[in-house]
């Protein structure tokens, strides 16, 4: 069953709870949630789309094209089978059926990171063709490779939406040596000039 949500700018949000249904208010035990996750019955649903306007950021209910764009992203799957550690201090997602590194990224986020990594890898030979030295090519691609790693901090399903006074923003993932479970996440646009922007990542 899928629940449809509305975007509103007035009223009070529902009380925050990690173990209660937002729709019915019924309690949901963590053993049940974890079992559903391990059975592959937990998915993702696009709830809202944010855009920047003259008077600030605005949020809208996604239309069919935006929803389809999120669902139709097709990553290569080359890293899909790389497993997460079976257990570890601060690693909590495995209990919910997230056992591979690819489980920490939405299909669209995987496409972004794969594209960035592929372009950076191709730069080495291009620099040599243009007359650069092997040392220079290694230095450039190594630095940009680190930028791809940094981009993953903003392109992950562990990124939450931080609501605060003034302008809200995406809270980056992997800021600490923990991989916690998150119940909603924000997808960054790598070309929007905000958190997760590729050029901002490179210049910082």
Where are these regions (language model features)?
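Nucleic-acid modification enzymes, centered on SAM-dependent nucleic-acid methyltransferases
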Residues: 1-204
């Amino acid at each position: 069953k899928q629940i449809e949500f509305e975007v509103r700018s007035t009223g009070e949000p529902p009380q925050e709870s990690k173990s209660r249904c937002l729709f019915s208010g019924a309690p949901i035990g963590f053993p049940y949630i974890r079992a559903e996750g391990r059975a592959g019955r937990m998915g993702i649903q696009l709830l809202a789309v944010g855009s920047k306007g003259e008077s600030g950021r605005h949020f809208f209910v996604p239309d069919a094209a935006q929803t389809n764009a999120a669902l139709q992203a097709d990553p290569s799957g080359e890293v899909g089978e790389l497993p997460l550690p079976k257990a570890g201090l601060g690693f909590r997602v495995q209990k919910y059926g997230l056992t591979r590194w690819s489980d920490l990224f939405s299909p669209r986020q995987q496409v972004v990171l794969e594209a960035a990594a592929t372009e950076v890898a191709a730069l080495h030979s291009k620099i040599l063709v243009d007359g650069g030295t092997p040392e220079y090519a290694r230095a450039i691609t190594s630095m940009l490779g680190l930028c791809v790693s940094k981009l993953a901090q903003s392109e992950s399903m562990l990124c939450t939406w931080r609501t605060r006074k003034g302008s809200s923003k995406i809270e980056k993932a992997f800021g600490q040596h923990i991989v916690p479970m998150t119940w909603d996440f924000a997808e960054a646009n790598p070309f929007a000039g905000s958190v997760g922007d590729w050029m901002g990542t490179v210049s910082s």
